[in-house]
Amino acid sequence: MYKCALVLAAGQGKRIKSDLPKVLHKVCGKEMVNHVIDTIRKAGIQDANIIIGKGAELVKERTEEKNVTYSLQSEQLGTGHAVQCASEFLKGKKGTVAVFAGDTPLIKESTIKNLFNTHIENKNAATILTAIVDDPTGYGRIIRSGNEVLKIVEHKDCNEEELKVNEMNSAIYCFDIELLYESLSKLSNNNEQGEYYLTDVIEILKSEGHNIGAVITDFEETIGVNSRAQLAQAEEILKDRINLKHMENGVTLIDPKTTYIGIDVEIGKDTIIYPNNIFEGNTIIGERCTIYQNSRIKDSIIKNEVDIQSSVILDSSIGNNTTVGPFAYIRPESKIGEKARIGDFVEIKKSIIGDGTKVSHLTYIGDAEVGKECNFGCGTVVVNYDGKKKYKTIIGDHSFIGCNTNLVSPVQVGDNTYIAAGSTITSEVQEGDLAVARAKQRNIKGWVDKKGLKK
């Protein structure tokens, strides 16, 4: 059977008080609407249409890689009106369509599958995802007669008896596409808000004798984000889920409460994560690594048995058995080899560092290719920028760079070379050479007395 989805993402979200469309606020490093789309796809629904409105172009930009289509809701006149705006997407289709809110990032793949299966197996015209809550204030109520679903009443339109109902509408549904399409033209805005409610479709279908079903799920999954406080709540819930998944897969988190792992991050077994670490984007961390406190790693590949302490690694790769930090900064497009050492207060920018090379402290390497088994003394600087353009430096294998050396790019240093401490290198150093580029020391006798500086 054909399955598709509509994602309602047209609202600005006044309560969140932001210039950014509400659905583009991130939870665990990913936009809420993209959480919804990714979960839909995992549940086996490939055809999705996003209903956009406020900030439409920005929403399209942030979701363009998801292979979705779009419908425009120019005026926000309610959820029913939003689905009406997707009529062209629905027209002529047969099967089942699910409707999701773009601000519900906690919905699970298994719940979506269960909703579809229940809907199809029971041949329902509509199936509502619901939850039981102690305080349903603000939510639409599921009105039943026994176990039979009769209708959904929005909170502001509830009478005294309906307000006592604690089964709430999650705003996630499955519909028979043809029946939904026919019902959209029958919606009315005769209510307190003057809006077209998608929930009224339930009552329309029921009045026509169609079967309406409901699937009850955990309230946590249905939380819609309408404020910064709810955004933080969703972040905390999803963070706990992610951390639990990694611990179940063999990763040790010393303090899960202070460990922030993005939803797309992968971590190998027997890796140990200390407190106050942040892993973001498409980061992959291998097995048997130790990530000590206060590190941030984003969009990077960390191979096996790597030790990292109090460092920042962005869009780079670190080879097996390498150590990084403390207080190292690996900037984008850097590649660090195996068994290397990147020490304290070292900055690597857009450079390749060969296997076994040691850059132990207080060094800047930018736009460089460094061979294997090299050693950098303290205070080395690759001078790669002349104020207009950045230039490349190449350093061969087994080279020794003395302390306080400046390598003025573009420059090439051959294999097995030595550079004396304090040198400023401006031209090629050939293989096997020692380069000394510093002024000869000159001692001026009696200078302190002559200047009257003796104490």
Curated annotation (Swiss-Prot):
Region (Linker): 229-249
Single Gene Ontology MF annotation: UDP-N-acetylglucosamine diphosphorylase activity
UniProt KW keywords: Acyltransferase, Cell shape, Cell wall biogenesis/degradation, Cytoplasm, Magnesium, Metal-binding, Multifunctional enzyme, Nucleotidyltransferase, Peptidoglycan synthesis, Repeat, Transferase
Chain coiled-coil ranges: none
GO BP of this protein: cell morphogenesis; cell wall organization; lipid A biosynthetic process; peptidoglycan biosynthetic process; regulation of cell shape; UDP-N-acetylglucosamine biosynthetic process
GO cellular component: cytoplasm; membrane
UniProt name for this protein: Bifunctional protein GlmU
Cofactor list: Mg(2+)
Catalytic residue list: 361 (proton acceptor)
Gene3D superfamilies: Hexapeptide repeat proteins (2.160.10.10), Spore Coat Polysaccharide Biosynthesis Protein SpsA, Chain A (3.90.550.10)
Cell location: Cytoplasm
Binding site for acetyl-CoA: 384-385, 421, 438
EC number per UniProt: 2.7.7.23, 2.3.1.157
Family membership: In the N-terminal section; belongs to the N-acetylglucosamine-1-phosphate uridyltransferase family. In the C-terminal section; belongs to the transferase hexapeptide repeat family.
Stretches for region Pyrophosphorylase: 1-228
Binding-site list for UDP-N-acetyl-alpha-D-glucosamine: 8-11, 22, 73, 78-79, 140, 154, 169, 226, 331, 349, 364, 375
